[in-house]
Amino acid sequence: MQQEPDRNEQGYCSSPPSSNKQDSSDDTKKIQRREKNRIAAQKSRQRQTQKADSLHIESENLERLNSALRGEISGLREELKYLTCVLSTHQPVCVLGPTKPQAILPHVGSTRYQH
């Protein structure tokens, strides 16, 4: 005569008895792993936020520097216009006679000084 497997009230076969200590140890390890993972994820999010903040600050600083440099370029262009005008006004009345720009400003036209 064959022995029938143990059945619970719903008619399912019961699983073989398991060690409560093993389950408890596995649960503890799961909880510890989840906690460790949660902390690692939190640190990762903090680093990501700090990096984004740092990039934002750097971007703002570069924008300010860019604006200042554009202002300086604008000022230098205005000064160039003014000096060109002064020179063109002075040339007709200059007693020294016509001179080549290279004699006055040797670096003008030289590729060595161009940026």
From Swiss-Prot:
Listed GO biological process terms: defense response to protozoan; DNA damage response; DNA damage response, signal transduction by p53 class mediator; hematopoietic stem cell differentiation; isotype switching; lymphoid progenitor cell differentiation; myeloid dendritic cell differentiation; positive regulation of cytokine production
Residue ranges, annotated region (Disordered): 1-57
Name this polypeptide is given: Basic leucine zipper transcriptional factor ATF-like
Residue intervals of the bZIP domain: 27-90
UniProt family annotation: Belongs to the bZIP family.
Function according to Swiss-Prot or TrEMBL: AP-1 family transcription factor that controls the differentiation of lineage-specific cells in the immune system: specifically mediates the differentiation of T-helper 17 cells (Th17), follicular T-helper cells (TfH), CD8(+) dendritic cells and class-switch recombination (CSR) in B-cells.
CDD domains, sorted: bZIP_BATF
Residue ranges, annotated region (Basic motif): 29-51
Segments of this protein annotated with the region Leucine-zipper: 55-83
Keyword annotations from UniProtKB, A to Z: Activator, Cytoplasm, Differentiation, DNA-binding, Nucleus, Repressor, Transcription, Transcription regulation
Chief location bin: nucleus
